[in-house]
Amino acid sequence: MGNSALRAHVETAQKTGVFQLKDRGLTEFPADLQKLTSNLRTIDLSNNKIESLPPLLIGKFTLLKSLSLNNNKLTVLPDEICNLKKLETLSLNNNHLRELPSTFGQLSALKTLSLSGNQLGALPPQLCSLRHLDVMDLSKNQIRSIPDSVGELQVIELNLNQNQISQISVKISCCPRLKILRLEENCLELSMLPQSILSDSQICLLAVEGNLFEIKKLRELEGYDKYMERFTATKKKFA
């Protein structure tokens, strides 16, 4: 796109605090945004061809609350992303991320994280440090197992649909706020689903269709009645 068009977007963003430039074929993060590091609350550069984020620039958006880079070509995130201390929403669906920076747990204000359609092979342990995270979408990755560290997650909703999960730690039942757990279209045998999810957790919506067992078999497990009590109580609350 032309420089004059980009300038117009930058000028508008100076007034609104919102910079949105989607579907423009951008191959890099616009350097002109360095003029707006103290203005911007929202950046949306989805549906472009951006391969990397400039480390020195990205960490300067200290007032940023929402960052969306869905449908780009990102392979790594710079450590400097951890400087975004006010960031509440981070959306990076459909990129090529295999891991997250070790500093990721320092995004202390983060509430919503979307990483669907990447190449994560494991549940990143850094996510367990995010105390205010409410919703996390890790669907359509390559995660094979859920480790013990999952018990420290603070999320209310966890989407792990369409991974390759065949093992889940019993610690998932210890998540203090987890209400919605989505595990559809994975590789789970019924024997690998911790019974404590049904009997001893806060989970009131468990979605497990498309695994290696029939749903009616789930209803025969000990603890299913307790799960249904929670499910029904929640339904009534929102009816």
From Swiss-Prot:
Keywords tagged on the record: Leucine-rich repeat, Lipoprotein, Membrane, Myristate, Repeat
GO cellular component: extracellular exosome; membrane
Each LRR repeat, start to end: 39-60, 63-84, 86-107, 109-131, 132-153, 154-175, 177-197, 202-222
Keyword match Glycosyltransferase: no
A matching Pfam family: LRR_8
SUPFAM superfamilies recorded: L domain-like
Keyword match S-adenosyl-L-methionine: no
InterPro entries: Leu-rich_rpt, Leu-rich_rpt_typical-subtyp, LRR_dom_sf, LRR_domain-containing, LRR_R13L4/SHOC2-like
Gene3D superfamilies the UniProt entry points to: Ribonuclease Inhibitor
Bilayer disposition of the protein: Lipid-anchor
Lipid tethering residues (N-myristoyl glycine): 2
Location in the cell: Membrane
PANTHER family per record: LEUCINE-RICH REPEAT-CONTAINING PROTEIN 57, PTHR48051
Identification of the protein by name: Leucine-rich repeat-containing protein 57
Gene name of the record: LRRC57
